[in-house]
Amino acid sequence: MVIGYTTGVYDLFHIGHLTLLKNAKGLCDKLIVGVTVDELVLYKGKQAMIPYSDRAEIVRSIKYVDAVVPQYDMDKIAACKKLGATVLFVGDDWYGTEKWKKYEEEFAKEGIKIIYFPYTKGISSTKITEALKTTRGWSNDHSLMNKKKDNESNHLNA
């Protein structure tokens, strides 16, 4: 059985995410998806619009996904080994970079193949976020995570 693994924030889930998951599932028997936890998103200098628990539930509901695990760090080799994955699916924007050439060698030593998928042209969570900021006048702190925290505070104060 071929176990595949891929990771992502999966914020503002869009057709590019769906295409990646569909294509990945077509190349493995079991697809495990690591959804990046909120703390790691912040560590990488960004903020998710949708909280981790909601993003994980959205990804879990996709028919191509067999399991969802939290991605707490960037160590994909350790994750693949722990999960028994022999294939890692990543976006082709990393293809050919020095960093990923080294990763390919390291993964190969562990018997893990890296398969690159093309990004869906013209769509990304970042582009959607920017469009929302422009068209709706949203600021950087306009996220459902903040709304959820505000609602929780309001319920506690009621």
Give the ranges of each region predicted by the language model:
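Nucleotidyltransferase catalytic core that binds NTPs
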Residues: 1-158
